Amino acid sequence: MIFYDFEVFKYDWLVVLKNTEDRTTTVIHNDPERLKQFYEQYKKDIWCGFNSRHYDQYVLKAILCDMNPYDVSQYIIAQRQPGWKYSSLFRKIQLFNFDVMTDRYKGLKQLEGFMGSNIKETTVPFDIDRPLTKRELQEVIEYCQHDVEQTMEVFLNRIEEFESHM
């Protein structure tokens, strides 16, 4: 399984990918070719994210289709449109996606609180209109890694939900 989370800014995007089989963590920043290679290597695996059904899978597919992930992100978030409507090309990309978010009204931060976990936020604004500095990038990577780890915790606490889909 691959647990993943994207963070998208106007001039930067990154994804944290945790492979549960070999326990490796991969961070990809603004490198579509590296993401394509990773996807090709693991496209037969199950990819798990929090709200990935409505957001992350479309950012992934946009990058795989050489589209601007910021445009897709804005389409989904600012314009409140479903990601699948952005491009018919998305349907052609195989992705075995499992969304750990089973309740639309409970966000990851709320679940972290319920589990007694530390809630980590980023001070970097998502509407920043310039490339991230090295310090900001590092902060966002740490934030994203934390989100993936917490998504894995939520998954383990709700394993029966996953098993019911298998």
Predicted segments with their positions:
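Gly/Thr-rich phosphate-binding beta-strand-loop-beta motif of the actin/hexokinase/Hsp70
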Residues: 1-19
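Short, conserved catalytic/metal-binding motifs centered on acidic residues
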Residues: 5, 49, 147, 151
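Hydrophobic alpha-helical membrane context
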Residues: 17-19, 63, 159
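Acidic, Mg2+-coordinating catalytic module of metal-dependent nucleases/exonucleases
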Residues: 101-103, 107-166
